[in-house]
């Protein structure tokens, strides 16, 4: 019987199934950070349990960390307690920790692939909704809650029902300057922020195959923003070239065996999907969100829609509420809207290619007066590589702030946040009310678009910048 990639991955990991019961899946990798793990480790301690497979569990500090200093006290008492608890728990339970002073420390969804912890065919979980990022490698990766974190620590398994399947095919070639961020925002604009609910999404088509691994990670990172459980891209030579030689990747004959297996990880030609969505890459322009969910998005050269243009009453009400919160008027272009802050970073867009794209716009230019622009590399190795290439100097000369790795302004859990009423061009993944700080207004864009906004002082079409 023909199977989708998701069905192959799911079936390969079922360790127990019975009628009227949710199947039990084996978990190959468990990634842990300071925010969703303390209660899980406390639960193990209370029951006298150990971590069943500490060698398959990896931890880092990212959500709470300061991006201006390595001082554990810098982000406040709650952050300090959570980070100190993680240090204690990893020491006690034998889990490898990339702490504040580790050269490889960074955002959990950046360091996993970077170190080769993420490999095709795996099941990967983390107490974080953007775990879908790792699906770029053809692995089944999804976020879990704290009680599930405890269950995986204790058993290396998790009960998980079958999801529906969705194929998103992006045909043709994207225009120059159109990135994975623009593609995925255009997809979410078409499906809506709940269009993928109950599904695992597989991205395919010529435009997807043309993406680098970093682009594919951006794509899968935001699968959750259309309501999907996970996102997938079938592994290919681009995947294998990226992984070869990384710290936790197989070596020697094990590598050859692994690649031979990984090549089988693709949907069969006649596999049936529950839902199919198709977009033409050549129709996709640089995207900017205007509302308070990622589905409220337009091309940079389009006008903000009027609520009455939505036929669905729920969408109409949502648009009215979003426009009021964002303090925007329908019928205007976002290129007329001034900004206060720019954030280049997050598990969506903080890798070396993202920083290169932003630096190419920033080079020889200056951040507009009154705009604060920060660049936050996703990990220690990304920061080191960017500095070796001189990108930090380009940003600093242009008036951007060059920071230490961390989740930073993606979410208001550290010192990097918006003040009430401030408007931000952000390369992160969520533009919900208050996401970047109470009363803050978030517009999601690609790294190049964020850099262009910093220079112009308002949103700008990168296609007009030479």
UniProtKB/Swiss-Prot annotation:
Binds 1 [4Fe-4S] cluster per subunit. One of its GO terms (biological process) is L-leucine biosynthetic process. Pathway: Amino-acid biosynthesis; L-leucine biosynthesis; L-leucine from 3-methyl-2-oxobutanoate: step 2/4. It is an enzyme of class 4 (lyase). Its cofactor is [4Fe-4S] cluster. Gene3D superfamilies: Aconitase, domain 3 (3.30.499.10). SUPFAM superfamilies: Aconitase iron-sulfur domain. PROSITE patterns: ACONITASE_1, ACONITASE_2. The keyword Aminoacyl-tRNA synthetase does not apply. It catalyses: (2R,3S)-3-isopropylmalate = (2S)-2-isopropylmalate. It comes from the Bacteria. Its EC number is 4.2.1.33. Pfam families: Aconitase. Keywords: 4Fe-4S, Amino-acid biosynthesis, Branched-chain amino acid biosynthesis, Iron, Iron-sulfur, Leucine biosynthesis, Lyase, Metal-binding. One of its GO terms (molecular function) is metal ion binding. NCBIfam families: leuC, PRK05478.1, PRK12466.1. Catalyzes the isomerization between 2-isopropylmalate and 3-isopropylmalate, via the formation of 2-isopropylmaleate. This is 3-isopropylmalate dehydratase large subunit. It comes from Serratia proteamaculans (strain 568).
């Amino acid at each position: 019987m023909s199977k989708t990639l998701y069905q192959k991955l799911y079936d390969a990991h079922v360790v127990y199934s019975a009628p009227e019961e949710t199947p039990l899946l084996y978990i190959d990798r468990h990634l842990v950070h300071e925010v969703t793990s303390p209660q899980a480790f406390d639960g193990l301690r209370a029951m006298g349990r150990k971590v069943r497979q500490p060698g398959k569990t990896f931890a880092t500090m990212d959500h709470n960390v300061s991006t201006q200093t390595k001082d554990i006290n810098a982000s406040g008492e709650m952050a300090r307690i959570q980070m100190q608890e993680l240090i204690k728990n990893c020491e006690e339970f034998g889990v490898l920790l990339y702490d504040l002073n580790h050269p490889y420390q960074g955002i959990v969804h950046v360091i996993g692939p970077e170190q080769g912890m993420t490999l095709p065919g795996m099941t990967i979980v983390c107490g974080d909704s953007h775990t879908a990022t790792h699906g770029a490698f053809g692995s089944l990766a999804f976020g879990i809650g704290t009680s599930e974190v405890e269950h995986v620590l204790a058993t290396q398994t998790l009960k998980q029902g079958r999801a529906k399947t969705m194929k998103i095919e992006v045909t043709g070639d994207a225009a120059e300057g159109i990135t994975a961020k623009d593609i995925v925002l255009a997809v979410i604009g078409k499906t809506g922020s709940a269009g993928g609910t109950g599904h695992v999404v597989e991205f395919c088509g010529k435009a997807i195959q043309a993406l680098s691994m970093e682009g594919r990670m951006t794509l899968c990172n935001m699968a959750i923003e259309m309501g999907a459980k996970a996102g997938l891209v079938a592994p290919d030579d681009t995947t294998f070239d990226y992984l070869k030689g990384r710290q936790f990747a197989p070596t020697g004959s094990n590598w050859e065996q692994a690649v031979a297996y990984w090549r089988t990880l693709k949907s069969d030609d006649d596999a049936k999907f529950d839902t199919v969505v198709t977009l033409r890459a050549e129709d996709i322009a640089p995207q900017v969100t205007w509302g308070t969910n990622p589905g409220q998005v337009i091309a940079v050269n389009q006008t903000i829609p009027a609520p009455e243009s939505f036929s669905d009453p729920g969408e109409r009400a949502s648009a009215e509420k979003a426009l009021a919160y964002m303090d925007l008027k329908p019928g205007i272009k976002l290129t007329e809207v001034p900004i206060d802050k720019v954030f280049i970073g997050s598990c969506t867009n903080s890798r070396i290619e993202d920083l290169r794209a932003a630096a190419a716009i920033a080079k020889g230019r200056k951040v507009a007066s009154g705009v604060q622009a920060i660049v936050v590399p996703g990990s220690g190795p990304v920061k080191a590589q960017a500095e070796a290439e001189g990108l930090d100097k380009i940003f600093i000369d242009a008036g951007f702030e060059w920071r230490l790795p961390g989740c930073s302004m993606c979410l208001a859990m550290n010192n990097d946040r918006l003040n009430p009423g401030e408007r931000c061009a952000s390369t992160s993944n969520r533009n919900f009310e208050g996401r970047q700080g109470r009363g803050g207004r978030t517009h999601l864009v690609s790294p190049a678009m964020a850099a262009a906004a910093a220079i112009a002082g308002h949103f700008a079409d990168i296609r007009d910048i030479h």
